[in-house]
UniProtKB/Swiss-Prot annotation:
Designated gene of the protein: scpA
One GO CC term, this protein: cytoplasm
Keywords for the protein's UniProt record, in alphabetical order: Cell cycle, Cell division, Chromosome partition, Cytoplasm
GO biological process terms held by the UniProt record: cell division; chromosome segregation; DNA replication
Pfam families: SMC_ScpA
Assembly mode: Component of a cohesin-like complex composed of ScpA, ScpB and the Smc homodimer, in which ScpA and ScpB bind to the head domain of Smc. The presence of the three proteins is required for the association of the complex with DNA.
Principal location: cytoplasm
Role, per record: Participates in chromosomal partition during cell division. May act via the formation of a condensin-like complex containing Smc and ScpB that pull DNA away from mid-cell into both cell halves.
UniProt keyword Cytoplasm, yes or no: yes
Protein name as annotated: Segregation and condensation protein A
Lineage: superkingdom: Bacteria
Subcellular location: Cytoplasm
Length: 251
């Protein structure tokens, strides 16, 4: 496959990914099941590497940290007791990570509040619509859907890969096709226009060839970044749907 890297602002670092997993899995941040969160984290990082996304070294450092915490949590009781005399009080191996996550969550919440206030100030200089009923209805419908992040998209892509591996027949000959990202983007836009409706994310992956799967996913990320598509998800872990934005339907 042609080497291609996608850099998107959504990738804010390993703490952001961990917080995403905690929220999506509805985990108590003060009592993190390390084995579960480590497994999910490593799966995401592996998928990001397969997609040739720009995975910073800090993601790998966090992976090592999680594995270290996991191993300490699995220490037999007898081994734990050997260290008790050297410690003033028993420490939870997760404490430092939990503290960092709580601080990061505060920072992220504050940043979100500042952004919302800035958007509100910008709206104050525009003329509001005379009839707000339709506008209010639209907002209400939008709020019923989750805010879909790139991490959600990676999770959905993981499911696609798993299904393709299960259904993929044995092949004696492998044909390698290099597909430009731009061409796949145009094909997706054309499909959305032809369908005239929102389509399921999985419908974009008819091929079983890994190169085609990866290029398709990268094309979706680019369309997201360019605001050419709208991503919707009704609830955690449910299907993701894609709709063309006004920019492509008006073209």
């Amino acid at each position: 496959m042609v080497e291609y890297q996608v850099k998107i602002d959504t990738f804010e670092g390993p703490l952001d990914l961990l917080l995403h997993l905690i929220n999506r899995l509805e985990i108590d941040i003060y009592d993190i099941p390390v084995a579960t969160i480590t497994e999910q984290y490593l799966l995401y990082v592996h998928t990001m590497q397969e997609l040739e996304l720009d995975v910073a070294s800090e993601y790998l450092v966090m992976a090592a940290t999680l594995l270290s915490i996991k191993s300490r949590m699995l220490l037999p009781k007898q081994e734990e007791e050997l260290f008790e005399d050297e410690m003033l009080e028993e420490e939870d191996p997760r404490d430092e990570l939990i503290e960092k996550l709580i601080e990061y969550r505060k920072y992220k919440t504050a940043a979100k509040d500042l952004k919302e206030r800035e958007e509100e100030r910008q709206k104050s200089f525009t003329k509001p619509p005379s009839d707000l009923s339709e506008y209010a209805k639209e907002i209400k419908q939008t709020e019923q859907k989750l805010s879909v992040t790139v991490y959600d998209m990676i999770g959905a892509f993981q499911k696609v890969l798993q299904r393709k591996k299960i259904t993929r027949p044995k092949e004696t000959t492998i044909t390698r096709q290099e597909i430009p990202i731009e061409d796949r983007m145009n094909e997706i836009v054309k499909s959305l226009k032809t369908a005239g409706r929102r389509i399921n994310f999985t419908e974009l992956f008819p091929s079983r060839q890994k190169d085609h799967l990866v290029v398709t996913f990268l094309a979706v990320l680019e369309l997201m970044k360019n605001q050419q598509i709208i991503i919707e998800q009704e609830e955690n872990f449910s299907d993701i749907y894609i709709t063309g934005s006004e920019s492509i339907h008006g073209a």
